Amino acid sequence: MQCLSIIAKSIGSKLSPHLSQIIPALNRLSEGLREDESIDEDNELAETALSTLEAIIRKCPLEVNDYIADMVSRSFELCAYDPNYQYNDDEDDEEMKDDEEDDGEGWGDEDFSDDGMPEDDDDTSWKVRRSSVAIIDAVVRTRPDRVKGIIAQYADTLIDRVKERIDDVKVEILNTFQGIIKSSMEVKESSLELDLKAQSSI
């Protein structure tokens, strides 16, 4: 797996003749996650598989055309994979109000262990979320033609993930928003250019 990941990131275009075997295998490796528990070994394997898929998309954006829809769908599912944490918007709002009202004494103590690290510091599920978002980013940046469909189908899901609790993942999400905006502008500019050419030829 590590060798395949290195090859995909360096000379991924060479893998194009074998994508029909490679992509389904990588998809299977990223699907072995338990919904009720975060297991480090499974997370590491899924992260490697997803990172390899991301590299393949960036190196072979046209060759993966038949697989993009499934990869995007799966990535949006995995970008919310956080079995050890329960998000509660109402509680978050209350906590923000409490933080604004206190003087900072005892700030965040309940969220940290004795050594000052977050209690869930050993939870590696964030690596799966970050890698899955990176796949979405790879698609929107290399396949601008897919952006409109992604926005129509998954915009609400991606916006909801801004609540992500891990900074590394949140940065990847914001980068993806940036990629969506950039690719959308490129598509509009291309369409405008085609319209102008069509009008000038009349």
Give the role of each language-model region.
Residues 1-202:
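Karyopherin-beta/Importin-beta family HEAT-repeat alpha-solenoid scaffold
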